Amino acid sequence: MPVRQPITREVRVIFSSGERGFTAKDVVDCALVRGEIDPLWKEFLRVAECDRLANERELESDDSALDSAAIAFRYKHDLITAEETERWLEDRGVSLAEFSDYFARQYWGRSYSGTLDPPKSSYETASPEEKDLFLADLILSGSLDRMAERLSYRVAAQADEASDNKASLDNERARFLAAAKIAHAELGDWLALLCRDQEWLDETLAAEAVYQQRVSQILTEQALQKELAPMQLHLTRFQLETVEVDSRNAAAEVVACVRNDGMEISEVAEESRYPFHRSEVLLEDIPLEQQQRFLSVKAGTLFDPIPRGDAFEVWRVKTRTEPSLQDPIIRARLERRIVDRCFNELLSKYVDWKLFVPPSE
């Protein structure tokens, strides 16, 4: 009986439509055409260089930080036992050693502070080994899931389209060449680096054109206004001022200085040398257990101290802003909801997930 070769990461089928399966390589290559790979590749090179230099200098990582990162990963993916984690990794072609190495790279990507000059190579010209390691990072970071979801929308849109539109394809091809800065005469060489041909590119661009046309039809101002109406409260924006202290008594002093003495919370933090920062958050992004206290607050509201492990935080609402379609973040949230709802209906008709569950489900 012949020995079966292990399935490599890039050829594992993530979803299918009809009789065609879409592999991890399909997902990454199509994301490359959409312009999504370049920033991820640059970050991958930066993190890998941090890791290389840290190991070269024999720096020691914080084992507790690595353990915490692995535990957080398992919690996020609902992997309770070691066996479930191993099965999850095996299904995706990732070894336990690669799992551990990923968290070590991420640790040094955050912690390494030495001089850095990462390589300037592109994804297209990278070695097979580099691309394979990059794919492992995409899997473990969740980026591949999101790319797969975006590709599935385009595949479903094309499957639902009754006819081809050559003009749209020509426009999409021109847009792609301009965005990728590829001369038409160089296109064949670029495709060869990916082991792809013109037919594949035309199929990818045709699906993109159909998807963009469908999106333009559903994202009208009227649709956005309708979507916003029931989301007014959830999309309310709060600017928060936060002071971090090490005891309940210290937190009580901060509250007293603000409420009784009329001091700005930033002044209290500066005088007492407490960590202070400002942030903006939408109500729907606040943990559920904290949302209730925000429902009726006004600008200037000071919350009672909030426990954070062995420390405490004091929050003050600096501003409260009602959502508006002129706010690009609010607009993007609403657009995402409309697009997800539309294409999830198409996915149920045209796409069968084999490996990943799309994030929006």
Model-derived regions: residue spans:
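Peptidyl-prolyl cis-trans isomerase
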Residues: 1-12, 21-361
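Structural motif
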Residues: 16-17
